Amino acid sequence: MLSQIYPQAQHPYSFELNKDMHISAAHFIPRESAGACSRVHGHTYTVNITVAGDELDDSGFLVNFSVLKKLVHGNYDHTLLNDHEDFSQDDRYSLPTTEVVAKTIYDNVQAYLDTLENKPTCVQVFVRETPTSYCVYRPKKGGLNG
């Protein structure tokens, strides 16, 4: 994978890790206002997850990279996003737009991180839908662990 430069999230933590991955998935936005995006189409998404924290686990990890890949790539790669429960409601915060995909990945990753004793936090999720279009989701400061 080609090295990427991402917008950086400011945070007070000592450690920061980033996990890159690609997800090939289809979706559609069931709204007339979405234009061509209302038809089923696909992307090879580039996803970057930024996790930060002050404490390492017993293995010396902030979080195991392979777990992050399983949480995201394992769930969404080669699927129709609209078929996932995460994107099945007919409201603007459940439609599989790049914005909602980024927030949903954050929610799923943070839910896992909350189970870890060392309490790392997801500070940013970057989702690139096309070479020229991407979204960054960062939780509001009150949402960070700490």
Swiss-Prot record:
The prosthetic group or cofactor this protein requires is: Zn(2+)
Q: Which reaction does it catalyse?
A: 7,8-dihydroneopterin 3'-triphosphate + H2O = 6-carboxy-5,6,7,8-tetrahydropterin + triphosphate + acetaldehyde + 2 H(+)
**Pathway in which this enzyme or protein is active:** Purine metabolism; 7-cyano-7-deazaguanine biosynthesis
EC number(s) from the headed UniProt entry: 4.1.2.50
The UniProt GO MF terms for this protein read: 6-carboxytetrahydropterin synthase activity; metal ion binding
Cofactor info, note text: Binds 1 zinc ion per subunit.
Q: Where in the sequence is the active site?
A: C37, H78, E129
Q: Which residues bind Zn(2+)?
A: H27, H41, H43
Its BP terms in the Gene Ontology are: queuosine biosynthetic process
Q: Does the keyword Transport apply?
A: no
Give the matching Pfam families.
PTPS
Report if keyword S-adenosyl-L-methionine is assigned.
no
Q: Which domain of life is it from?
A: Bacteria
Q: What class of enzyme is it?
A: lyase
Keywords annotated in UniProt: Lyase, Metal-binding, Queuosine biosynthesis, Zinc
| Family stated for the protein in its record | Belongs to the PTPS family. QueD subfamily.
Oligomeric state and partners?
A: Homotetramer.
Q: Which NCBIfam families match?
A: 6PTHBS (TIGR00039), queuosine_QueD (TIGR03367)
- Relay the record's extra comment: The active site is at the interface between 2 subunits. The proton acceptor Cys is on one subunit, and the charge relay system is on the other subunit.
Q: What role does it play?
A: Catalyzes the conversion of 7,8-dihydroneopterin triphosphate (H2NTP) to 6-carboxy-5,6,7,8-tetrahydropterin (CPH4) and acetaldehyde.
* The protein, known as: 6-carboxy-5,6,7,8-tetrahydropterin synthase
Q: Which organism is it from?
A: Bacillus subtilis (strain 168)
